[in-house]
From Swiss-Prot:
Its main location: secreted. Transmembrane segments: none annotated. It is found in: Secreted; Secreted, Extracellular space, Extracellular matrix. Residues 311-321 have a biased composition (Pro residues). It comes from Drosophila melanogaster. Disruption phenotype: Females produce eggs with normal chorion morphology but that are fragile with increased chance of collapse after oviposition. Embryos within these eggs fail to cellularize. Follicle cell microvilli involved in vitelline membrane biogenesis are disorganized and vitelline membrane biogenesis is disrupted. Residues 236-270, 309-329 are annotated as: Disordered. The keyword Cell inner membrane does not apply. Minor protein component of the vitelline membrane. Involved in vitelline membrane biogenesis during late stages of oogenesis. Required for efficient disulfide and non-disulfide cross-linking of several vitelline membrane components. This is Protein palisade.
Length: 381
């Protein structure tokens, strides 16, 4: 009983640990915490956002480059009075103790090779002739708040040109002016109906319309082209003349009666040309064998089932030897030595053929070689 309770407690403990691990693993990717600079997820999400439109592509690229560059090369604290920020209540602490670099105090930090940041600093250039002090933007007081509020505007009119107008700044509008711009007060636009004067020439352009009926005058010329139509009956006249050769057709009908007789030679018709082709009637002879008896049929079926071993034809007689060994003794003049081997004169010389050669050789060379071998075997060469 105690063992069962211990097993149950261990099982419950393992299940609880599994649930805790599963929930913690699920919470990791579901976290909405924004990654801070320095973490890999920060730079990855800068260029891969789920709700980023294509129009934001360049902005995202610039943002990732700026953040990466700023984190890689942090600013020093000597860039013109804390980066032109005179905040005395919450001064920013230096990120890293960077070595002092020459600062020309013109808004361009030349030690930063970031093109995007350079373009942003270009818009913050100081005046053309700054005050002669180590920090131009601060006026020399780097640790003081040197902001001076501008004096209130005086109500005087004229002088500096910034005062309030004596009539309270109200300008009475000109009711008759309806032109564009401030410098065209005397401009009066021409009346729109005056531009409609060129409209009457439009009916004057319709005058060329009457020549259109004059172009219809050639229409009566069409009946003049129909005059050749009566010539069509004149072409039908040859048809009546051509009907005359029709009577000779019955002259060819007499040979038809000759076919009723015993296939006799038909009378040749009287017409110019080659005689008609003769029709040769070839008799068809059907050959048949007498019906075989049942015993012979069964014998034939039984013979078909036997396997007759074919007898091999007798081997052909061996061909007569082309080369006859010389009857002389072996003491013959020795042949010149071959490059690799020497064949004794008593043995059969080597015969070469096209099959023995790995390369293509002219057949005439083999014929000449074999011919000289034959002569040498007879001591003629």
């Amino acid at each position: 009983m105690m063992m069962h309770s211990r097993n149950r407690s261990w099982t419950l403990t393992l299940l609880a640990l599994g649930v805790v691990l599963a929930t913690s693993a699920e919470d990791l990717p579901r976290s909405n915490r924004i990654a801070v600079p320095g973490e890999p997820l920060y730079y990855l999400m800068a260029d891969a956002g789920p709700v980023v439109t294509p129009n934001e592509a360049l902005k995202r690229t610039n943002r990732s480059l700026l953040k990466w560059w700023d984190d890689l090369f942090p600013r020093n604290n000597n860039n013109c009075c804390n980066n032109n920020n005179n905040n005395l209540l919450y001064p920013t602490a230096p990120l890293l103790p960077a070595p002092a670099v020459p600062n020309n105090c013109n808004g361009l930090q030349l030690q930063d090779l970031d093109p995007f940041k350079q373009m942003k600093l270009f818009k913050k250039l100081p005046e053309l002739f700054p005050t002669a002090s180590p920090c131009g933007q601060c006026g020399g007081g780097c640790g003081q708040n040197n902001y001076v509020a501008p004096a209130p505007q005086s109500p005087s009119y004229g002088g500096d040109g910034y005062g309030v107008l004596p009539n309270g700044g109200y300008i009475k509008p000109d009711t008759e002016y309806n032109g564009p711009g401030d410098g065209d007060a005397g401009y009066v636009a021409p009346a729109a109906p005056a531009y409609e004067a060129p409209a009457p020439p439009a009916p004057a352009y319709e005058a060329p319309a009457p020549p259109a009926p004059a172009y219809e005058a050639p229409a009566p010329a069409a009946p003049a082209y129909e005059a050749p139509a009566p010539a069509a009956p004149a072409y039908e006249a040859p048809t009546t003349d051509y009907s005359a050769p029709a009577p000779p057709a019955p002259a060819y009908e007499p040979p038809a009666s000759s076919y009723t007789q015993g296939y006799s030679q038909p009378a040749q018709p009287s017409y110019v040309g080659a005689p008609p082709a003769q029709i040769v009637y070839q008799p068809i002879i059907y050959l048949s064998t007498p019906l075989a008896s049942k015993s012979s049929t069964s014998q034939v079926e039984y013979d078909d089932q036997k396997y007759v071993t074919p007898t091999a034809p007798p081997p052909p007689p061996p061909p007569a030897p082309v080369y006859e060994a010389p009857s002389q003794n072996c003491y013959q003049p020795a042949a010149p030595p071959a490059p690799n081997y020497a064949t004794p004169s008593c043995q059969t010389p080597i015969r070469l053929s096209l099959i023995d050669q790995p390369y293509r050789v002219a057949p005439e060379l083999f014929e000449e070689y074999n011919y000289r071998l034959a002569l040498a075997s007879q001591n003629i060469l």
